[in-house]
Regions:
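Bacterial N-terminal signal peptides
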Residues: 8-17
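Beta-rich carbohydrate-recognition and catalytic domains
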Residues: 23-44, 50-97, 105-257, 261-310, ...
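Sec/Tat signal peptide C-region and signal peptidase I cleavage site
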Residues: 19-21
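Short glycine-centered, acidic/aromatic-flanked micro-motifs in structured strand/loop junctions
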Residues: 101
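Bacterial N-terminal signal peptides that target proteins for export
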Residues: 1-9
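C-terminal structured domain segments
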Residues: 310-316
C-alpha cells in the first residue's frame, strides 16, 4: 500500500465511519488496461510506486513462475505519463532467483526495493534457502545493493512506513514455518520487533499493510494451510503502536498475492488472486480481482475482476489524481505479461 493523505478516521477495534459499510454495493469501474511489458519469457510479481514525479514499476523476469535453473532478474521500468514505459534498471545476482520486487519510499526520500534471493538449485521441503535483500536508489536508475537483511531463511516481503519507521513481516517457509515482524529506519538494517507473529504451523506468508490516521497498523495476510478450509482463509490483523500485540480475525476468502490500500475517504480496497473452488494448484481456475475490505465484519466483498487468468496477481496499488492505479501480471492472453489498470471508485 502506498502513502495516501487525507485518510478518514478508524475507530478501534475494526470500526469504520458509517459511510464505509455501503461499499459492498458499489462496483469499481476499470477505465483502462494496458500491457506495459512482456520482454522476457515470463514477466511477473509486480509493484508500483510514484517517485520524483515519475511512475516506477518493478517485477521479475524469468523463464517461468519458478523452478530449478530459473534465475530470475528484477526489472525496473519507469514512465512520465503511465503510457510510455522504458527500462530504468535490471538487477541480477548470479546463481540465484531474485523474486518479488516491492517498492517503497524511505524517510530520506530514496526508492527502496525489497526482494529475496531464492536458491532454487539448493532447496528442500524443510527450509527454503532464502536470503532477503534490499536495493536503494536516489534516482530510480542507479541502485546500491543487494544488502542482506533479516534472519537467514526468512523471506521479508515488503516494507510499509509509519512515522519514520518501516515495518515488514518476514516468513520462513517449509516444515518449520515461522513468522517475524521486523522494523527498519533506513531500509538497510532490519531488527526483529516480534517473534512468532503467527503460531508455527499456521503457514502464514505474504502480507500487505497500511497505517490509518491514528497510527494503527492493519495487515492482510495470506495463509496456505491445507489442514482445513478455515485454516487456509486469509487473516486481518490490527495493532496499536508499538505494534507488538496483534489482534487477528479470519477473513471469508482464500487469497494469494495480497495488496491493500485505504483511499482518502477511508474505504479499504484489496487486490488479490482468487481461486475457483479454493484450488491453489489449478492455474486455470485463478484470476485477479479488486474488492472491498470491511474490518468491522472481517469480510472481503468482490467488486471487479481485472482482465486476467491463469498465472496472475501480485498487484501494486497507488492512489493518484482520484484514480486507483494498479500494476499486475497475468497470462490470460497467453504470454505472462505486465499490465497497468486505471480504476475509478464511485463515491
Amino acid at each position: 500500500m502506498k502513502t495516501n493523505p487525507l485518510r478518514s478516521l478508524l475507530i478501534f477495534p475494526f470500526l469504520l465511519c458509517s459511510h464505509v459499510n455501503a461499499e459492498d454495493r458499489v462496483a469499481m469501474k476499470v477505465l483502462n488496461v494496458q500491457k506495459i511489458w512482456d520482454a522476457a519469457p515470463h514477466n511477473a510479481f509486480t509493484d508500483l510506486e510514484r517517485f520524483n514525479g515519475r511512475w516506477y514499476c518493478a517485477f521479475r523476469e524469468g523463464k517461468g513462475h519458478a523452478g530449478g535453473g530459473d534465475y530470475g532478474k528484477l526489472r525496473v521500468i519507469h514512465s512520465e505519463d503511465g503510457k510510455d514505459w522504458k527500462s530504468a534498471a535490471l538487477l541480477e545476482t548470479k546463481g540465484v532467483d531474485l523474486r518479488d520486487a516491492k517498492l517503497s519510499i524511505t524517510p530520506s526520500g530514496k526508492l527502496l526495493l525489497n526482494s529475496c534471493e531464492y536458491r532454487v538449485d539448493n532447496d528442500n521441503a524443510d527450509i527454503r534457502n532464502n536470503t532477503s535483500v534490499t536495493y536503494i536508489s536516489s534516482n530510480g536508475t542507479d541502485w546500491k545493493g543487494p544488502t542482506q537483511i533479516a534472519d537467514k531463511g526468512y523471506w521479508l516481503w515488503q516494507t510499509t512506513w509509519q512515522a519514520g519507521i518501516g515495518y515488514a513481516l518476514g516468513y520462513r517457509w517449509g516444515h518449520r514455518d515461522a513468522t517475524k515482524l521486523y522494523q527498519t529506519k533506513d531500509g538497510s538494517e532490519y531488527a526483529q520487533l516480534v517473534n512468532h507473529l503467527r503460531p508455527p504451523g499456521d503457514r502464514s506468508n505474504e502480507h500487505a499493510m497500511f497505517f490509518d490516521d491514528e497510527g494503527r497498523a492493519h495487515m492482510l495476510l495470506r495463509r496456505d494451510n491445507a489442514t482445513s478450509k478455515q485454516a487456509g482463509l486469509a487473516l486481518l490483523g490490527q495493532s496499536e503502536a508499538p505494534y507488538t500485540d496483534w489482534e487477528w480475525r479470519r477473513l471469508n476468502v482464500t487469497i494469494g498475492g495480497p495488496s491493500i490500500i485505504q483511499i482518502p475517504d477511508g474505504r479499504i480496497i484489496a487486490c488479490v488472486r482468487r481461486y475457483a473452488a479454493e484450488n491453489h494448484r489449478d492455474w486455470g481456475s485463478q484470476w485477479t480481482e479488486i474488492g472491498w475490505i470491511n474490518p468491522a465484519t472481517a469480510t472481503y466483498t468482490p467488486s471487479t475482476k481485472l482482465p486476467s487468468g491463469g498465472d496472475s496477481s501480485y498487484a501494486g496499488l497507488v492512489w493518484h489524481n482520484g484514480l486507483l492505479w494498479i500494476s499486475y501480471y497475468s497470462s490470460h492472453n497467453g504470454k505472462t505479461s505486465i499490465y497497468l489498470a486505471k480504476v475509478s471508485i464511485p463515491g
